[in-house]
């Protein structure tokens, strides 16, 4: 998907942030400000900026997490745009599992995560959010940033689980979506009938990446 696309209506470009030390160590990290990008994550952000250099970006948004803002920064700079921090699009909160990396914690989150894709959107970890909670805050934020846009692209840098859950909701699906790698993109186009999927970056999940079936990132 690139700047030569001639479709009608604005596009929402959902991006997952670059890699962090928490991704590498399989630490459950859902709450802002969270971990910053590591060295590879910074390189991935620059690669994303190069990839999107010719895209007709109208605005660049990021969640309240440091890693999403760092990922968005080089993209925004290349287009002469600011990075606007947007409430409501942070990762799904994992409650009492925050900061843990032990096998028991990862298994507990994976159980809840899989329940969502089986249709139990109200499932949650102790003290955490459900998929319904995520949708209730994420979807109004999308409407806020895209509602007045008639053409071009709006970039929103968010998180692995959040992107998957939000995209599924926008597309009217509850079935499992694809894994999104670090700085992977999900491109949706809005038309009078709603949202349509244009492209979805995916790859073989990195070993231990919980957003493949589990961990927030």
Region roles according to the model:
Residues 1-11, 92-104, 147-152, 168-217:
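Acidic, low-complexity terminal tails and accessory targeting/binding regions
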Residues 2-3, 7-9, 47-113:
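Phosphate-coordination/substrate-recognition cap region in phosphate-metabolizing enzymes
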Residues 11-17:
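Short, hydrophobic/glycine-enriched beta-strand segments
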Residues 19-75, 124-139:
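Loop-to-helix element that buttresses phosphate recognition and phosphoryl-transfer chemistry
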Residues 22, 36, 79-137, 196-201, ...:
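Phosphate-handling substructures
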Residues 74, 165-169:
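Active-site signature of alpha/beta-hydrolase-fold catalytic machinery across serine-
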Residues 159:
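Short basic (Lys/Arg) and small-residue
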